[in-house]
């Protein structure tokens, strides 16, 4: 179920959300992150400090004719998957579909996963959200400059266009998160701030996380380890965006997924896509 909001209500909701949860989880639309890097998450795959600079995309409208929003669940979780599609993705989709749970996929199109790109159509048809991640996921390329970043996004959308309506994808996740430090090696200290401003000016929303599965740190963690990581990172949080991966090297994430879903169900969480949890203001 999609939660629609008027622009006025949306701004108020986000203000309250940032005040009530930000101190605990350090998040917003694009600022879901912990104040300390979760144990085992690579620095290059983390958002190490809260980002308090989020503003609504330029497409936000002051028109207040939208229906009143449906109430948000008190406890909700967004399961998000980066770096797919790959040979792991069918197992992830199978687990999600069996459980009746919708997720959000921040996809890549590197040229090495071409044969799996049709899975994007399958995921979208099943009601999962497709969102943008990167064409190459090469930090040294995409973070050379703002122009380099947007060329990567344009290439990604071009490669996705046979499988999904790419011009309708307005959510993205920066490789490494919105306040990553790895980008400084290539584009300087101010690059991420510039990109965040450009993203919102263009009408996109960037999305981070406040729960890390630690499934892409190397060493091929077991399904049990991934499950325990998520339970630990969730802690007492009641509004969670979980970072997982459906890459070729994270097969155990798919194995852990049924137990992860069941744990959240047992603890009273509703499952939302990112666009359901944090919808863009309607025009």
Where does each model-flagged region fall?
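Catalytic domains of cell-wall/extracellular-matrix polysaccharide-remodeling enzymes
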Residues: 137-243, 247-263, 269-270, 276-277, ...
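Terminal accessory/targeting
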Residues: 1-78, 94-103, 162, 210, ...
């Amino acid at each position: 179920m999609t939660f629609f909001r008027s622009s006025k209500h949306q701004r108020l909701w986000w203000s309250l959300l940032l005040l009530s949860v930000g101190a605990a989880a350090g998040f917003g639309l694009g600022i879901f992150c912990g104040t300390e890097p979760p144990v085992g998450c690579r620095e290059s795959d983390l958002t190490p400090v809260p980002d308090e600079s989020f503003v609504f995309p330029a497409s936000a409208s002051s028109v207040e004719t939208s229906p009143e929003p449906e109430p948000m669940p008190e406890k909700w979780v967004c399961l998000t998957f980066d770096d797919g599609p790959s040979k792991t993705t069918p197992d992830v989709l199978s687990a999600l579909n069996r459980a009746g749970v919708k997720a959000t996929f921040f996809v890549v199109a590197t040229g090495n996963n071409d044969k799996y790109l049709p899975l994007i159509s399958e995921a979208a048809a099943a009601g999962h959200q497709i969102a943008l991640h990167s064409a190459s996921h090469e930090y040294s390329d995409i973070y050379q400059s703002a122009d380099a970043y947007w060329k990567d996004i344009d290439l990604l959308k071009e490669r996705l266009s046979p499988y999904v309506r790419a011009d309708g994808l307005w959510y993205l996740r920066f490789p490494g998160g919105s306040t990553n430090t790895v980008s400084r090696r290539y584009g300087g200290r101010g690059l991420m701030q510039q990109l965040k401003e450009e993203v919102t000016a263009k009408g996109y929303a960037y999305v981070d996380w406040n729960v890390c599965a630690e499934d892409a740190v190397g060493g091929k963690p077991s399904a049990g380890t991934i499950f325990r990581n998520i339970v630990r990172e969730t802690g007492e949080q009641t509004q969670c965006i979980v970072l997982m991966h459906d890459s070729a090297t994270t097969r155990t994430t798919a194995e852990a997924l049924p137990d992860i879903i069941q744990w959240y169900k047992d603890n009273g969480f509703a499952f939302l896509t990112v666009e359901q949890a944090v919808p863009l203001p309607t025009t």
